[in-house]
């Protein structure tokens, strides 16, 4: 079909051709099937087939090329042998000669291309400077408009990658994304103005409106989210994920921020990691911090080397070298509370100026404000401590009610649980010194050791239930399981299993000494007794100033049998004692003060002379 002056004028055997317009398909001889609509469209084609040209001079110079489509004034104007091209729009692909497999849609799209292949340009002026580059995709007005030889580029959006000339392997999706990039390679921008100022920088990713918008020559920056890394113009190797993450950073290097507003105010701080909404959001120059959780380290500006994990942990401080892990751990810590470590829910929550504290466990050292050099390990250990310092609580509830007391050590479940102001105590074992409140300088080692002691001072109890009933007396020492268990008096010394145990609860004897298993174990009262040896003085209940020396001394197995009461007695050995040795003789004094029932001697000298001594 031919309509127009010289349309299909030279055709010989070409079939299924359509020519509409003056000189349309004028030189065609055997080419088939072609469609040409417009003045001079496909006018030079001879044997090329399956071409479609619509518009003045469209595909005008094509001779033997196949499968081309040109719609628009001068579209594919200079193409000669290039195949499988699509050009839609005035001047689209108008400089192409032998290039193949290109698609250009829009005025002047790919208008400078000569030999480049497999390019796609959709939008006016898109890829309009491209000459020999291959494998590029540009969608949007002016996208990749300056590219000449850069390859493997993807630009979607008005002016996307508009300044790119020779750079390769960039992806820009969004109006003005990567629009200043000239030679920078291997960048990805997704969102309005993402990586918009980058010129020669490489290996960066910006996803979101204005993401990494100010960067120019930097490397390895990643910004994902609205305004993420917005102002970064010199720092490198930063990662920002979230709305306004690292928004004000400019010069910081090696930072990672994931979460809304985290590290928002950072300027030159380096090597920080922030995960969670507003984590480290006011940090400016602080470096080497780790903050994980909503509002974690949110008050820090210049402090460095902090590790914070948990919602609002270390929320108020601008300080360094601090560890807070757990919800609101070190929540109120201020700028002078330094070198603290808090691990656990609300651990050291209210600390303000206290320094060099260690808290591990839920609510450990929770109420501490100014106390320093404390160590708390275990649920609620040292929970109520406020100003006390140099305390160590290890175990569930250990020293949990301590407030202002210092220099205490409690190890074990409920050890020194009730202590408030008692100082310089040591308790090791479950319930050891658990009821102590104000007593000081006590040492309790063993389950229930000094368990009932409240205000007593200077006591030592070592062994299960040793001195367990002692409450307010002091200066007592008990070593051995259940040694002094029922004793409530002071200044006693008990060494050995059940030594000084007492017949029943409430034994109030004082200043007694018992050494040996079961020694003085049946007493209820009595003072200044000394029992040394297994079972020595075992049966005495209320006597005072007695001395029992040797195994079973004073029992039914001893001389004169069991002694239950009495004062000022001395028992040496037991019924099996064979000999008693002493290097010198005993000195027995005769003193009127030690005698009773004294009467006059009236017998006279004759009676004395008559005596016959044997």
Put a short name on every predicted segment:
Residues 1-591:
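Glycine- and small/polar-enriched repetitive beta-structure motifs of secreted/surface proteins
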Residues 195, 450, 590-614:
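Intramolecular chaperone/auto-protease modules of tailspike-like proteins
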């Amino acid at each position: 079909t031919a309509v127009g002056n010289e349309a299909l004028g030279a055709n010989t055997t070409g079939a299924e051709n359509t020519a509409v317009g003056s000189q349309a398909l004028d030189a065609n001889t055997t080419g088939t099937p072609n469609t040409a609509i417009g003045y001079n469209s496909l006018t030079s084609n001879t044997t090329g087939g399956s071409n479609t040209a619509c518009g003045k001079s469209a595909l005008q110079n094509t001779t033997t090329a196949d499968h081309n489509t040109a719609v628009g004034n001068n579209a594919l104007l200079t193409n000669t042998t290039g195949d499988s091209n699509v050009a839609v729009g005035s001047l689209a692909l108008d400089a192409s000669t032998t290039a193949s497999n290109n698609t250009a849609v829009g005025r002047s799209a790919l208008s400078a291309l000569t030999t480049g292949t497999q390019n796609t340009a959709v939008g006016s002026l898109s890829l309009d400077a491209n000459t020999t580059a291959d494998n590029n995709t540009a969608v949007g007005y002016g996208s990749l408009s300056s590219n000449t030889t850069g390859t493997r580029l993807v630009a979607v959006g008005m002016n996307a990658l508009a300044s790119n000339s020779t750079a390769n392997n960039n992806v820009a999706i969004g109006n003005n994304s990567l629009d200043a990039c000239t030679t920078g390679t291997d960048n990805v921008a997704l969102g309005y103005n993402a990586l918009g100022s980058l010129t020669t920088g490489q290996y960066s990713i910006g996803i979101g409106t204005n993401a990494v918008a100010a960067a120019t020559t930097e490397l390895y920056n990643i910004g994902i989210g609205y305004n993420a890394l917005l102002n970064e113009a010199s720092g490198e190797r930063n990662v920002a994920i979230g709305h306004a993450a690292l928004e004000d950073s400019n010069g910081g290097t090696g930072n990672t921020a994931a979460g809304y507003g985290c590290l928002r105010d950072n300027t030159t701080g380096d090597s920080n990691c922030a995960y969670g909404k507003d984590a480290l959001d006011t940090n400016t120059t602080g470096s080497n911090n780790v903050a994980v959780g909503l509002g974690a380290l949110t008050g820090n500006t210049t402090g460095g080397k902090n590790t914070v994990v948990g919602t609002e942990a270390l929320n108020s401080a601008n300080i360094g070298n601090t560890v807070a892990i757990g919800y609101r751990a070190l929540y109120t810590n201020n700028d002078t509370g330094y070198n603290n470590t808090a691990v656990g829910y609300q651990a050291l929550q209210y600390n303000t100026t206290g320094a060099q504290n260690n808290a591990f466990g839920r609510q450990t050292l929770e109420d501490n404000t100014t106390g320093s050099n404390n160590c708390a390990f275990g649920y609620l250990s040292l929970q109520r401590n406020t100003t006390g310092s140099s305390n160590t609580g290890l175990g569930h509830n250990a020293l949990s009610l301590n407030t202002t007391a210092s220099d205490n050590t409690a190890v074990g479940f409920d050890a020194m649980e009730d202590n408030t102001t008692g100082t310089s105590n040591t308790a090791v074992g479950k319930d050891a010194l658990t009821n102590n409140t104000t007593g000081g300088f006590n040492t309790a080692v063993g389950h229930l050791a000094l368990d009932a002691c409240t205000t007593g001072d200077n006591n030592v109890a070592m062994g299960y239930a040793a001195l367990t009933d002692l409450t307010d007396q002091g200066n007592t020492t008990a070593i051995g399981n259940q040694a002094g268990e029922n004793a409530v008096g002071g200044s006693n010394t008990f060494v050995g299993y059940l030594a000084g145990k007492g017949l029943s609860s409430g034994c109030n004897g004082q200043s007694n000494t018992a050494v040996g298993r079961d020694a003085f174990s049946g007493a209820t009262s009595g003072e200044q007794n000394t029992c040394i040896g297994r079972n020595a003085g075992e049966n005495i209940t209320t006597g005072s100033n007695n001395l029992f020396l040797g195994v079973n001394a004073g029992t039914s197995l001893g001389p004169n049998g069991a002694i239950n009461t009495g004062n000022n007695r001395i028992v040496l050995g037991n019924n099996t004692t064979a000999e008693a040795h002493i290097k010198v003789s005993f000195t027995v004094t005769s003193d009127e003060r030690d005698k009773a029932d004294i009467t006059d001697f009236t017998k006279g000298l004759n009676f004395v002379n008559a005596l016959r001594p044997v």
